[in-house]
């Protein structure tokens, strides 16, 4: 019997949270860069 590996689910969750973190940093960096460069 083959069961789904919980490690694969953990890797997928970490990858998704990493992408959300990068997106959040990018969204926050745009107004800060506009504020600093003006």
Curated annotation (Swiss-Prot):
Key word Iron-sulfur present in the record? no
Looking at the UniProt entry, the stretches that span the membrane are: 17-37
Supply one GO BP term: photosynthesis
Look up keyword Membrane and say if it applies.
Answer: yes
Specify the protein's topology with respect to the membrane. Answer: Single-pass membrane protein
Q: What is its main location?
A: plastid
A Pfam family: PsbL
Where does the protein end up?
A: Plastid, Chloroplast thylakoid membrane
* Record keywords: Chloroplast, Membrane, Photosynthesis, Photosystem II, Plastid, Reaction center, Thylakoid, Transmembrane, Transmembrane helix
Q: Which SUPFAM superfamilies match?
A: Photosystem II reaction center protein L, PsbL
Gene Ontology CC terms, in alphabetical order: chloroplast thylakoid membrane; photosystem II reaction center
* Functional summary from the UniProt entry: One of the components of the core complex of photosystem II (PSII). PSII is a light-driven water:plastoquinone oxidoreductase that uses light energy to abstract electrons from H(2)O, generating O(2) and a proton gradient subsequently used for ATP formation. It consists of a core antenna complex that captures photons, and an electron transfer chain that converts photonic excitation into a charge separation. This subunit is found at the monomer-monomer interface and is required for correct PSII assembly and/or dimerization.
Q: Which family does it belong to?
A: Belongs to the PsbL family.
What HAMAP family does the entry give? Answer: PSII_PsbL
Q: What does the subunit comment say? A: PSII is composed of 1 copy each of membrane proteins PsbA, PsbB, PsbC, PsbD, PsbE, PsbF, PsbH, PsbI, PsbJ, PsbK, PsbL, PsbM, PsbT, PsbX, PsbY, PsbZ, Psb30/Ycf12, at least 3 peripheral proteins of the oxygen-evolving complex and a large number of cofactors. It forms dimeric complexes.
- What protein name does the entry list? Photosystem II reaction center protein L
